[in-house]
Swiss-Prot record:
Keyword NAD: yes
Listed name of the protein: Probable nicotinate-nucleotide adenylyltransferase
Species whose genome carries this gene: Sulfurimonas denitrificans (strain ATCC 33889 / DSM 1251)
Keywords: ATP-binding, NAD, Nucleotide-binding, Nucleotidyltransferase, Pyridine nucleotide biosynthesis, Transferase
InterPro entries the UniProt entry points to: Cyt_trans-like, NadD/NMNAT, Rossmann-like_a/b/a_fold
């Protein structure tokens, strides 16, 4: 295995938009493996609702039957914020090429990422479409039709927007969390 797609994120909660991204990535013929990497701590967010161990558990349940998909707890096990550059360097010890998958909503802050200039030399960016955000030609565009975000979902949790394999568990968790914050 030489080529991977790295799809990192908070996944707080995981939703059908994340599943749609994985389905679109599976169509890339040169990707040997898709690695989903939940963050321990997102540098652009102040907190998480679901603990990292629970987010990893949900993702593993959702994608357990996908042969080319692995849910990695590498960043979670570091018990700290892990810059993407660090994760990329770690993975390049085992793989030759990395497609780094981000949502179009991340483009506005991309140049603020830790060691962005070095990172763009190490990975090929793949940008999932979202909210009609224009994707510059320097990136590979990944067409995804789901109009959903984890933030919107936390504010108005809907079973229909959650992955079927653990929808009820995720729904119940966020319903209870929402009640605590009201």
């Amino acid at each position: 295995m030489d080529t991977i797609a790295l799809f990192g994120g908070s996944f707080d909660p995981p939703h059908i938009g994340h599943e749609a991204i994985i389905e679109a990535l599976k169509k890339f013929k040169d990707i040997d493996k898709i690695i989903i990497m939940p963050t321990f701590l997102n540098p652009f967010k102040s907190n998480f609702y679901a603990p990292s161990s629970l987010r990893v558990k949900w993702l593993r349940e959702i994608f357990k039957e996908e042969k080319r998909v692995e849910v990695s707890d590498y960043e979670v096990l570091q018990n700290r914020q892990v810059p993407t550059i660090e994760t990329a360097k770690h993975l390049l010890e085992s793989y030759k090429k990395i497609y780094l998958v981000i949502g179009a909503d991340n483009l506005a802050k991309l140049r603020d990422w830790n060691s962005y200039d070095e990172l763009k030399e190490l990975v090929t960016f793949v940008v999932a479409t979202r909210d009609d955000i224009e994707i510059p030609d320097e990136f590979i565009m990944l067409s995804v039709d789901e109009k959903i975000s984890s933030t919107q979902l936390r504010e108005n949790i809907q079973l229909s927007k959650l992955p079927k394999k653990c929808a009820k568990e995720i729904y119940d968790f966020y319903k209870e969390e929402h009640c605590k914050t009201e």
